[in-house]
Curated annotation (Swiss-Prot):
Organism classification: Bacteria, Pseudomonadati, Pseudomonadota, Gammaproteobacteria, Vibrionales
UniProt keyword Membrane present: yes
Cellular component GO terms held in the UniProt record: plasma membrane
Keywords annotated in UniProt: Cell membrane, Membrane, Transmembrane, Transmembrane helix
Family listed: Belongs to the UPF0324 family.
Protein name, entry field: UPF0324 membrane protein VP0936
Coiled coil: none
Compartments (UniProt record): Cell membrane
Pfam families, A to Z: Cons_hypoth698
Transmembrane regions listed in the UniProt entry: 7-29, 44-63, 75-94, 104-126, 133-155, 165-187, 199-218, 228-250, 257-279, 289-308
Keyword Hydrolase: no
Highest rank taxon of the organism: Bacteria
Record's bilayer topology term: Multi-pass membrane protein
Length: 310
C-alpha cells in the first residue's frame, strides 16, 4: 500500500471532526501537498467537485427565506449595489494588474456575496480548477481573519451605532461566521442586523452562479468550446430553501442536514488544499492577495462612507 495513504487518511478523518474549521482544513491539505503526501492516483478533483455541489445543496436548508426577505429597503439597495459594483470593479482591477480571470472572478464573487460558500457555488459554473479555487479561498480566509478583529475596533473608533455597524459588517465582511463574530463583539442589535442582511446577501449565490455560467460559456466559445456549464445544483439549493420554508416543523432535520453540509464543506476545502503547494503559490505570485485586499478595502471604505454620510 502507498505510504502516502496513511497521513492522507488520518488528515481526512481529522477534518471530519468538529474541531477543524474551513481555514485549518485548507492549510492541512496545503501542507500535505507541499510535502508530497497526497496520493496522486486518487480522483480527488472529480470527487471534490461532486462533494462541493452536495455541500451547497445542504447549506440551503440553513437559509431562513422569510427572515432573509425581511430586511429594510435601504439594506437591500446597498446589498445589490455592492454586489454588482464588486463584480464590475473586480473585473477592472484584474485587468489592470493582469491577474488570471478565473481566480479574480472567484475572489470577486466571494467578496461580493458570502466568502467561501459563494466561491464554492460559483466555481463549478465557471469550470474553475482546484488550484484557482484554493487561491481564492486562501485570500478570502486571510481577509476574514483580519476583519474579525479590525472591524469592531474601527466601529468603536468612529462611534458607529449598532444598526450601522451591523449593516456594514454584513456588506464588507466575506464569510457569515466572521460577520457573526465581529457583530456579536459589537452588540446584540448589531448581531441581529448583520445576520439578517447576510442571509439576504447569501440568496444572491443563486443568480450570480447562473449568470456566471452564461458569461464564462461565451468566453469558452471564443476559445473553441461551445458547451454551457449549467450549475444544476443551484436549483436543488433553491429547492432546499423552499422545502425548509414550507415545512418548518422539520427544523431539527434541517439543522442536522445543514451541520453535515458544513462539515462536508470543510472536507472539500481539505481536498482543495491538497491541490495547492508552495511551488504553485510561488508561481501565482502575490497578485491574488493584492487583488483581494484592494477590492476589499474599496468595498469596505465605500460602503462605510455611504452609511455614515447618508
Amino acid at each position: 500500500m502507498n505510504r502516502k495513504y496513511i497521513p492522507f487518511g488520518l488528515a481526512l478523518l481529522f477534518c471530519l471532526t468538529p474541531f477543524v474549521s474551513s481555514p485549518i482544513a485548507l492549510v492541512i491539505g496545503f501542507l500535505l501537498a507541499s510535502f508530497g503526501l497526497v496520493p496522486t492516483e486518487l480522483p480527488i478533483a472529480s470527487f471534490t467537485k461532486k462533494l462541493l455541489s452536495y455541500s451547497i445543496i445542504g447549506l440551503g436548508f440553513g437559509i431562513n427565506f422569510e427572515q432573509a426577505l425581511s430586511v429594510t429597503s435601504d439594506g437591500i439597495g446597498l446589498i445589490i449595489a455592492t454586489i454588482v459594483g464588486t463584480l464590475v470593479i473586480g473585473s477592472l482591477i484584474a485587468k489592470v494588474i493582469k491577474l488570471e480571470t478565473t481566480t479574480a472572478y472567484l475572489i470577486s464573487s466571494g467578496t461580493a456575496i458570502c466568502g467561501g460558500s459563494a466561491i464554492a457555488a460559483v466555481a463549478p459554473a465557471i469550470r474553475a480548477k482546484d488550484e484557482q479555487i484554493g487561491l481564492a479561498l486562501a485570500t478570502v480566509f486571510v481577509l476574514n481573519s483580519l476583519a474579525l478583529f479590525i472591524f469592531p475596533v474601527i466601529g468603536h473608533a468612529l462611534n458607529l451605532d449598532q444598526h450601522t455597524f451591523g449593516t456594514w459588517a454584513a456588506i464588507a465582511i466575506h464569510d457569515t461566521s466572521s460577520v457573526v463574530g465581529a457583530a456579536s463583539a459589537y452588540g446584540e442589535e448589531a448581531l441581529t442586523t448583520a445576520t439578517t442582511l447576510k442571509l439576504a446577501r447569501a440568496l444572491w449565490i443563486i443568480p450570480v452562479a447562473l449568470i456566471s455560467a452564461v458569461i464564462f460559456s461565451r468566453g469558452n466559445k471564443e476559445n473553441g468550446s461551445k458547451k454551457l456549464v449549467i450549475p444544476y445544483f443551484i436549483f436543488w439549493y433553491c429547492a432546499a430553501i423552499a422545502f425548509s420554508d414550507f415545512f418548518p416543523q422539520l427544523e431539527v432535520v434541517y439543522h442536522g442536514i445543514f451541520t453535515i453540509a458544513k462539515q462536508a464543506l470543510v472536507v472539500c476545502l481539505f481536498l482543495i488544499g491538497c491541490s495547492i503547494s508552495i511551488s504553485k503559490l510561488k508561481s501565482s505570485g502575490p497578485k491574488p492577495l493584492l487583488f483581494g485586499v484592494t477590492l476589499w478595502v474599496l468595498i469596505s471604505t465605500t460602503s462605510l462612507s455611504w452609511l455614515v454620510l447618508r
